[in-house]
UniProtKB/Swiss-Prot annotation:
Belongs to the LeuD family. LeuD type 1 subfamily. This is 3-isopropylmalate dehydratase small subunit. GO terms for cellular component: 3-isopropylmalate dehydratase complex. Keywords: Amino-acid biosynthesis, Branched-chain amino acid biosynthesis, Leucine biosynthesis, Lyase. The keyword Aminoacyl-tRNA synthetase does not apply. Heterodimer of LeuC and LeuD. It catalyses: (2R,3S)-3-isopropylmalate = (2S)-2-isopropylmalate. HAMAP family: LeuD_type1. It holds the Pfam family Aconitase_C. Catalyzes the isomerization between 2-isopropylmalate and 3-isopropylmalate, via the formation of 2-isopropylmaleate. Pathway: Amino-acid biosynthesis; L-leucine biosynthesis; L-leucine from 3-methyl-2-oxobutanoate: step 2/4. The keyword rRNA-binding does not apply. One of its GO terms (molecular function) is 3-isopropylmalate dehydratase activity.
């Protein structure tokens, strides 16, 4: 997992509430188990017209928002069926940070396990951030747990374990390898019984 200590990036806002995993990535695109190649299908039914041309009215298609790495969105983001592909699609598209009012528990966990930092902020803060100009950067300061922007600085909460994983770029496998000596010692002990 790629570390996130301080992330500086541009934003795009999709302020809908209750965006479910089928809207994030439709089930028709879930026929692979590789983690890459899903970004082109992110928000597919909204991003594309029936003829597969980009929908000019969809925020992610705005020419001045093409460099966005921070998605600002509504409440209950990632609700619906458990679908790790949704986190893969967001990351593959290039989003490193999602700022929402709340998340489905399973979706939140899928994001944290796949290197997408889910931040919870109140609606008032998100509405201000949603109005930031396309050429402005927003800073996510994870060690100090702050979203810093021209419209304000907003503190956020994150579990200490997840914070450590993001700051150090550790996924579950990397954490397991940190304990490899203890694992080997246990295996030798069990094998000798």
């Amino acid at each position: 997992m790629e570390e996130i200590k301080v992330h500086i990036g541009k934003t795009v806002a999709l302020m809908n509430d209750n965006i479910d995993t089928d809207q994030i990535i439709p089930k028709s695109f879930l026929k692979r188990i590789e983690r890459t190649g899903f970004g082109e299908f992110l928000f597919d039914s909204w991003r594309y017209l029936p003829n597969r041309k980009p929908n000019p009215d969809f925020p992610l298609n705005a020419p001045d928002r093409q460099e966005a790495t921070i998605l600002i969105t509504g409440d209950n983001f990632g609700c619906g069926s458990s679908r790790e592909h949704a986190a893969w699609a967001l990351l593959d598209y290039r989003f490193r940070v999602i700022i929402a009012g709340s998340y489905s528990d399973i979706f939140y966990m899928n994001c944290t396990k796949n290197g997408v930092l889910p931040i919870v902020l109140p609606r008032e803060a998100r509405e201000k951030l949603a109005k930031i100009a396309a050429d402005e950067n927003v800073t996510i300061d994870l060690p100090n747990q702050q979203v810093i922007s021209s419209v304000g600085t907003y503190p956020f909460e994150i579990d200490a374990t997840w914070k450590n994983k993001f700051i150090n770029g550790l996924d579950d496998i990397a954490i397991t390898f940190e304990h490899i000596d203890a694992i080997k010692a246990y295996e030798q002990k069990v094998d000798s019984i």
